[in-house]
């Protein structure tokens, strides 16, 4: 596999706030037509801005298609717990036998499988165990996601209890292994969350939808 090569991050955008502003302006115009004067402008602007913000909230209620990137051998049982959270639409789980058969087919087969399963996903969620940051296919998925303009985020899952092995040692941030030409790390623009050690599952369950929405809204690629 070739070495990581990332496109430079974009500057922060005000696009989402601009949409609300446009809604407010449109509301002011309509309000002034219906009720000429300052009162109509103010009322219409407030109504339009509120509608723009509420439309964004309604959109966020739908399940967002995501791709889970993780170290299969070590963390598949922990990842399954995340899959069971109903608010997220993840890529279909692969059984150990299917994964081994895919790997035996060669690197090209694995890459094609990743490319096809990632194609229509809006966000790539890297679920980080002890050795995730060193895995070649995780690195490929991160690089591809960034260069394809998809949202990215990481979640440490070492405190989720695997039925076989319990919890595990916290792994490194995989986004630290990517460096832009400027010298900045990918981790400087991609969020990585470390859930509570006391209630890791509840923390992830309560927040993952919001984390994903935030990653999509604020992505820099």
Show which residues each predicted segment covers.
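Short hydrophobic alpha-helical membrane-entry/anchor segments
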Residues: 32-39, 49-58
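Residues at the C-termini of beta-strands that transition into short coil/loop
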Residues: 94-97, 156, 193
């Amino acid at each position: 596999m070739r070495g990581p090569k990332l496109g430079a991050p974009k500057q922060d955008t005000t696009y989402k706030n601009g949409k609300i502003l446009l809604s407010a302006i449109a509301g002011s115009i309509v309000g002034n037509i219906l009720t000429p004067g300052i009162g109509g402008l103010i009322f219409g602007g407030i109504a339009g801005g509120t509608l723009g913000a509420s439309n964004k909230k309604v959109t966020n209620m739908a399940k967002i298609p995501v791709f889970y990137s993780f170290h299969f051998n070590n963390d598949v049982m922990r990842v399954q717990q995340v899959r069971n959270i109903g608010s997220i639409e993840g890529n279909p789980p692969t059984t150990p036998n299917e994964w081994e058969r895919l790997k035996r087919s060669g690197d090209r087969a694995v890459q094609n499988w990743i490319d096809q399963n990632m194609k229509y996903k809006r966000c790539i969620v890297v679920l980080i165990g002890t050795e995730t940051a060193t895995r070649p296919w995780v690195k490929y998925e991160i690089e591809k996601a960034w260069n394809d303009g998809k949202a990215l985020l990481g979640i440490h899952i070492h405190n989720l209890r695997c039925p076989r092995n319990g919890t595990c040692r916290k792994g490194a941030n995989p986004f630290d292994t990517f460096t832009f030409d400027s010298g900045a790390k990918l981790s400087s623009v991609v969020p990585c969350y470390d859930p509570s050690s006391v209630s890791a599952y509840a923390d992830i369950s309560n927040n993952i939808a919001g984390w994903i929405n935030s990653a999509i809204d604020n992505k820099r690629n």
